[in-house]
Amino acid sequence: MQILPLLAPAEARFELPASKSAANRLLIAAALSGARVEFEPAGLNADIEAVQRGLAAFGFRVEGGTGGIRVGPGPRAATAGARIDCGEAGTALRFLAALAALLPGEWELHGSARLLQRPFEPLADALRALGAEVRVVPGEGSAPSDRISSLWVRGRSPQAPAPRRVALEAQLSSQFLSALLLIGAELGPAGLEIELRGPLASGDYARLTARILERFGVEARAEGPLWSVRRRFRPAPEPMRIALPPDWGAFGVWACLQHASGSRIEAPGLDPQDG
């Protein structure tokens, strides 16, 4: 293959795939809200598809693909458990594990060997404190990549009182905090307070989660190391239509080309708050 350099600055405009960071949070918030939510067509990826599979396995109404995704309306169908393939998606594994902790039943989440080696224990400790059972299912091999087969979660009983506050170590990943924020408002009228122990990694992603929750009527706040969510999800009276924001990460190489060549490259829909 021959690659020829640009001889002069160029102009281009194109659509980027959907941001998996925003899409995964929006899908879970939409499912918990019970509202009818339609997501406008956008390029999907394996991470978003893994969250869709997980929501369907939990009994939520979710359908569609590249032509648009529809979630809800109504409560989830009763189901006592499922085995969910998260593929390579660390966000899906962590968010779906938190959602599994909220739902009665026994859930097994699995994926690639590399996925199951990623940090998870700080989130598992917090989910146990909320009343869920979480354990690692050992694999049959002796190699590091074969020592974990899957994660097993038994959801907490809806009748069991939930603690008002949990502690969390989030210096390894802000996804631990985002996962708890997504489910916290559904634990009861008082919601949930999350006390961070140590620094927070990539706090912008936690703030993205808070903004998304507020779109669905959940109050999310941060005061120093204490994060809180209150007010349960409220179904919108009318169907919601949401455009999935494009992925800043996918624009990175084009931004470099634009800077190096003096070209003008546009990708509509990029939100500076998501970058």
Give short role names for the model-derived ranges.
Residues 1-275:
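Short, structured segments at the rim of ligand-binding sites
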